[in-house]
Amino acid sequence: MTTATKQTVETLAQEYCEKITEANAEWRKQVRINGVKEDGYKCKLWFDEDGNYTGEKNAPYWTYIIGRKYLKGVAMEWKDDAQYGRINAAPAGYQASTVHAFIDKKTGDVFLPASWNAPAKGARFNLFQNKEALFEGVMNRPHGGYLYR
C-alpha cells in the first residue's frame, strides 16, 4: 500500500467522522427543540434566557483510532465521574464509548461493528466507490441505521 492511499483512506475516514458528528449534533438539537414544542419546558443546559438553543457544553464527537488492519470510528463522550463522588474515578475528559464503524485501511470498505474489537462480516459501503450514498445515509440516520442491510 502506498502512502498516498493510506493518507487518502485516513482523510476520507476523518471526513466520515466529521459528517457523523455534524449529523448527530443536528439530530440532538432537533430532539431538544421538539421536546420544548411538546411540553414547553426549556432546560437551562441547552437554552438561554431568550429561549435560543445554545448547544451542549461537552458535546460528543466522532473520531477514529488507528489499528493494525482497520480504522475504528468511535464516539467520544465526556466523562467526569469524580463530580459524582466516585472513588478512583477516571480524570475528567473525553473517552471512547462506542464503536460506530470499522474502515479497512487498504480498501476503504466500511463495516458494521460486531464488537469493540472486530467488524461484522461483509462490507456495507466503500469510501471510494459510493461516498455520496454513505454520507447521505449518515445525514439521514446518524446513529448507524444505514449500515444495516
For each predicted feature, which ranges?
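Negatively charged, low-complexity tracts enriched in Asp/Glu with abundant Ser/Thr
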Residues: 2-68, 75-76
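A short, surface-exposed interaction/processing loop segment used at functional sites
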Residues: 107-136
